[in-house]
Amino acid sequence: IITNKGFWLIELLCVLFYSAVFPFIKYAADLMVQKYNVDPKLAGTIPGLLPIGAIILTPLFGSLYDRIGKGATLMIIGSVMLIFVHTMFALPILNIWWFATIIMIILGFAFSLVPSAMWPSVPKIIPENKLGTAYALIFWIQNWGLMGVPYLIGKVLNNYCVIGGDEAMAEEITG
């Protein structure tokens, strides 16, 4: 397993992908309020589209993978979608709820596409008698990422983000 480059690429994708999705979902409701001016009572609705989309789309993408193969291509497409989503959420464009909804739906596609191709790809590159170790190693490293990324997000938010809009910023500057 240790010398299998394909395994390490899947491992890297797994830790980066899930570390870019799960912590984001934790902070997404606050993002909807702060950036998109969504009512706090409804702010969880937009990120809530993600699991609903995954329920519908993951079996469909799994079936697609079974029919056409092309696991690497499907994982790349899903990863590019994820990068696009995070870029759109990071840029100061279209700060309106419907834009956030569309971007969250695209994230739902990525969140379904990558795992439906990634997990069945592992047995294609790892011998059957090593699959338990391979999956355990994948989850072990993934959990390191899921532990570390929220910590890093918290550090960034605490050190570099101003919350409260123009009035709060002006008050901080002028005292």
For the regions a language model picked out, list residue spans one by one.
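Extracytoplasmic gate region of multi-pass secondary transporters
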Residues: 4-55, 115, 119, 149-153
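Helix-to-coil boundary motifs at intracellular loop junctions of multi-pass secondary transporters
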Residues: 31-36, 67, 121-126, 159
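Helix-to-loop junctions at the C-terminal end of transmembrane segments
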Residues: 57-70, 157
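C-terminal transmembrane helical hairpin of 12-TM major facilitator-type secondary transporters
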Residues: 71-121
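A late C-terminal transmembrane helix in Major Facilitator Superfamily
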Residues: 128-162
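A membrane-interface helix-boundary motif in multi-pass transporters
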Residues: 155-175
